[in-house]
Amino acid sequence: MTEVGWWKLTFLRKKKSTPKVLYEIPDTYAQTEGGAEPPGPDAGDPHSDFNSRLEKIVDKNTKGKHVKVSNSGRFKEKKKVRAMLAENPNLFDDRENKGQ
């Protein structure tokens, strides 16, 4: 008579183990004082273009809204180009002249 109903077992959740360290501070930040910026990459570095693109993708202000994750797991930047009517004032004029 003290059996637990099967439906109670469906709502029980196992406690997930939480890591003791949530994130680690890189050594470059730990060595700098206060809010000083870490040393930037060298201009002759072949990965400087990659690093600058990565910084743009991981920008905290946009919260990843401009980044799409593909099926393979790679991050791709969304590029949305919109034509404004102010840039193309004659966009609808041609249509009216042809009688459509």
Curated annotation (Swiss-Prot):
Superkingdom in the source lineage: Eukaryota
UniProt region (Disordered), positions on chain: 29-51
InterPro entries hit by this protein: PRR15
Family of this protein: Belongs to the PRR15 family.
Name of the protein in question: Proline-rich protein 15-like protein
Organism for this UniProt entry: Mus musculus
